[in-house]
Amino acid sequence: RDYESPEIRTKRIQQGVESWKELSEYGSTIGLKYLLWEPMSVPREVGETIQSAQRIQDFCKQGFTIPMKLCLDVDHGDVSSCNPEDTDPHTWIRHFKNDIQVIHLKQSLQDKGGHYPFTKEYNLRGKIVPQEILNSIKEANIKSCSLILEISHRERYPFESRVLADLKESVEYWRPYFTCGC
């Protein structure tokens, strides 16, 4: 319910950021170089639009001992937003180029319904193209970030029998983009 009230939502976000600030103080004492937070897809989970995520990131630039960086998920962003950029991973990459430390990769469909693998079936319908993501990273002049496959399967059949094959196919789909120096 708190996210439905702008005043209470802001207060809760600020409380969360204050907790992160305390974690940054501890993190600096144990040698961490940064902390991560991940913008999500719905208001209840925060950071669902570029504007909302930027607001939180701005709060995180105030008094942190170590920086708060972003874990950007190519499939996040609020599909109910009136701004089409809020579901465009390339816009997010360009906008947060100075804050991205990690990018979660998964195939993204219009329904935003899962952590889809990079298999022929999903790639035909999906919007995540490796070279386009890498081009956006390069154009944003991001010097270093970790790209992580974040693929999961429903714990149901027939998906259960496909897990390893889908993971292998996903790795093979991305492999040429990392072995060629692109």
What residue ranges belong to the model's regions?
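Active-site acidic/histidine proton-transfer and metal-coordination neighborhood
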Residues: 1-69, 166
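Histidine-acidic metal/acid-base catalytic patches
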Residues: 21-25, 50-182
